[in-house]
Amino acid sequence: MPEAGGRRLHEVARINLSVEPVNRWRMKPRLRRASPLSHHLIEAIAQTLEARPDIDPARVGVVGAFFFGCLEYSVRFYKGLSTDGRRFASPILFPETVVNTPLSHVVAELGIGGPVYSQVGDTSCWVSALRTACLWIENGDVDHVIVAGAEEFEPHLLDAFHALRWFTADHPFRIAEGAGAVLIGKKTPNAIAEITRIADGYTFRTRDQARIAGLECLGEFDMNAPVMNTATSWAAQKAASLLSNRQLVSLSQGPQHDGFTASSAWNTILAARQRHYPRLIVPHWGLSQNIAAVEISRTAENTAGAG
């Protein structure tokens, strides 16, 4: 739907919280006043658990990746603070502005007993969340980890993106909200894919530095491996230059929307489920801090017969 940012209109893909299946959480006591982010997140994580009823929630950890956090309640809280004064800044709203609050709601409602951790950064923090999950499993802290990326939209984002010059004439920047989640565990025969390489922590402060960071990050991977097309906004031009000599793969259909860490989750799922490539590099082009990437390989059983 179109959303206004100042005098400008932009296409935004939003979630209707009043329809199934998302609305099943609206009347839960803990979630009645929770942020939209909490509702996006719990639905994604609940679907992940429901797909594997055989695992023990007490031995499941959760790592959340967020770029913006609980925007709607943050705006309402600070608007009350700035317009009506400190004594009108509602203490009911403040807890819902904390970035770890949505995960707290989720694990309490779903009975998840393992460690819980929130990673905050641009889109690339999804890769750091995957690394954290892999370390937990390697250390024996848990049997499985759900890694989730989630974002909620608030119209002030549009003004911020204009100020940052993220809306470009050459690359339309379509925004989305939502959540996605993946379940990570030890290697088993029924796994659809595996993470075979992680490269993260390639930081930048300017767009010219971003190109160098991207070059160094992608240099960690085999030059002959196909690369998923995931770049948006100004990063799309940098990515096109860097990947001109590599096989670029587009898996999403229709206009590409950027849900930031939610899109990172969706792209990871697409890469794991595709059947055309034995391995696929999935870059995560942060627009403000870092560039990171993951190599996802199909298991031998699931690659067999791929066309």
Model-derived regions: residue spans:
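Active-site-proximal alpha-helical scaffold in enzymes
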Residues: L41-A46, A51, P102, E109-L110, ...
